């Protein structure tokens, strides 16, 4: 049976913004081209609309990560990858994504286009949706195979149909995980989706139960 993984960067989100620019007074201001995609009521940016707009991303953002890292998250919730990782995905014909460059940097905004439904997974909602844009924030990540659908393709990235406030959750097939690991990609952790028995052990959260779960993580 194939394995599937969730990608996490665990990088410092607050350092990196792609819809805002730094100014001399230490505050951030929104790029003019991105203003239409911010809700004036809840101030959430529609990341899908920003990515799919005809406008390119603005030059100016400084992407700050620890040395050697090739994955990052922006403050808005965009997933960022370096050019080398993008070339790897293209060379190995990985499917399920689109990418746009951030001008004058070695970084690209990654958008997952292959979506799958949730199964036995109930998101947590803290408050009603925005009365203007309608978005309702949910929390929680599907980390088990019984909680989320998986693609039929074996060489693809994928994501749930619904997007958390923190951005898209990036999932990948085992083949893609091995491509990244085998080619020395750096700066992320891949967490394998658990079967139902393993998930029960993880929920127990005891040292004895955790030891039963084998080969759960791939470190990049």
Regions from the language model: what does each represent?
Residues 52-80, 142-178:
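Short microdomains enriched in Cys/His and/or Lys/Arg
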Residues 79-95, 129, 170-186:
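Extracellular/lumenal glycan-associated surfaces
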Residues 1-104, 192:
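Long, charged N-terminal interaction/targeting segments
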Residues 70-77, 84-90, 96-148:
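Surface-exposed beta-loop interaction hotspot
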Residues 25-53, 115-155:
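Cys/His-rich short segments
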Residues 174-220:
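Long, compositionally biased interface segments
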Residues 49, 88, 137-139, 179, ...:
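Short loop/beta submotifs within extracellular cysteine-rich repeat domains
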Residues 5-9, 108-110, 170-172:
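Generic recognition of long tandem-repeat/solenoid scaffolds
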